[in-house]
Amino acid sequence: MPSLAVPHLTPISNEHLVSSKEVVFFWKNRIEMFEKKSDKVKQAEHKARDDGVELESQFIMRVPKELADTVHEAINAGTIKDRLTIQLDPDLRYGEVRIDDQILYTKLVDLPTVVESYKTIDNKSFYKSADICQILICKEEREDETEKESPNKNKKKDPNKVDKKYLFPHGITPPCKNVRKRRFRKTLKKKNVEAPEIEKEVKHLLRIDNEAVRVDYEIINEEDKPMDELEQSDIKPYNDADDDLQDESTMHASEKTIMEMSSQRHLQVESDDDEASNFPSHRAPNMGVAVHDIFGEEVSSTDDEDEPDRGNNTMQRRVMEESSRLSADDSRMSDFFGASGSNTGAGVVKMEQNVFSKSMFGHEASSPKLSAAGSSSNLAAPSGFYDSQMLAKREEFENMEFIDEPQPQYTQQQVQQKINQLTRQIRELKAQQVQKSTEIASIQNATLKQRMQETLDNLYTQVIERELELKDFENMLES
């Protein structure tokens, strides 16, 4: 085992040391050859470097606690050169350290942190000498030979990659414990990308662009694009059938809302009749049916003033959502609700008074639909809920026959222009179909092929729509 002598050791004051049990040595990275001379002349001759620059590497030597004081005393006394020797293996990872007569087995590992070291001559000016990124750990027990041998001995190693057993997990300060695991994430592995296939697809797309008759492109900045601008694909043509469907759905929504409200009243009245025996005895008998007779206890009290009326807000929100579904532009619905405005106004006044008459809760159902939509009990809807005028209006509305609005009248010249325009559009769409079909036949990528097929199906749909419109205008022209 070759011996590397330490010709000069410079002690560092305790304020620059991380721990009093660690000593920093300046180990010169130069090969020194010592030859035995005669007893009169014994001096070391070293081989000079070609560039004349002596570089040095620094590391921290960590020794056991009982020997740390001995090393500090030797450094302060200036006898460290005679009392301490360091011997390292050729791989510069394992070695031995002799302190007086005691031998320690060492291992040089890499720190996860970098510590800067400074030198001074006059204790006033400091200059940086090196970056300390290794630590020499000294132990009394020899390390197992199995740990020295790498398990992946036969594998090809990267010369720039350090073996994991030489990577120290901790720093030199307590906050840096397990810093390598906590601070540094694992290196992401590069995914294998099939470059030839991608290059082939790109060349194919470029070849299609070169063979195209015309290529149009437009640069659109999404930030500068106004919000009210709509794409042509999002604008649907006006159709009278859609309007009729909307009117029908609005009518069903209004009927459903009325039926749900009546069913809720049925449930409340039934529960109140079951709990009639629990009413307080001091209530006046001639007051009629009050709010608490139907809804039980009071809706709110002074104890709940701190909290908002969540139930009322929720109910109002539901009513607003249901009412928002109704179309305000529908003349038939406005006529229906306008005629019954007086009756509903009277109903609101009654609700505000919070007093109900017992005649409202009869046993005969005023409407078969409402009785069917109510609760499963024998209690029917109140007889005075709908008056005769309201029922007459409702029957008139249900029996009303909806007449389609008249289509706009076109002159013969306008019809001919529409026919020419639709014929030109159909011709252009069919030309695009032929071009897209040719492109799809030559595409091998499944995802791109599916996307192109969707575009082709859209073109087929547009052609069918234009042909139907063309047939309508041709019929108008013949008539």
Swiss-Prot record:
Q: Where in the cell is it found?
A: Nucleus
Annotated Basic and acidic residues bias: 148-166, 318-332
* Record SMART domains: TAFII55_N
Record carries keyword Nucleus: yes
Keyword field: Nucleus, Phosphoprotein, Transcription, Transcription regulation
In residue numbers, the region (Disordered) covers 143-167, 268-287, 299-332
* GO cellular component terms, semicolon-separated: transcription factor TFIID complex
Q: Which residues form a coiled coil?
A: none
State any single GO MF term.
RNA polymerase II general transcription initiation factor activity
Its chief place of residence is nucleus
One GO biological process this protein is involved in is: transcription initiation at RNA polymerase II promoter
Query: How does the record describe its quaternary structure?
Result: Belongs to the TFIID complex which is composed of TATA binding protein (Tbp) and a number of TBP-associated factors (TAFs).
Which function does this protein serve?
TFIID is a multimeric protein complex that plays a central role in mediating promoter responses to various activators and repressors.
Q: To which protein family does this belong?
A: Belongs to the TAF7 family.
Stated name of the protein: Transcription initiation factor TFIID subunit 7
Query: What gene makes this protein?
Result: Taf7
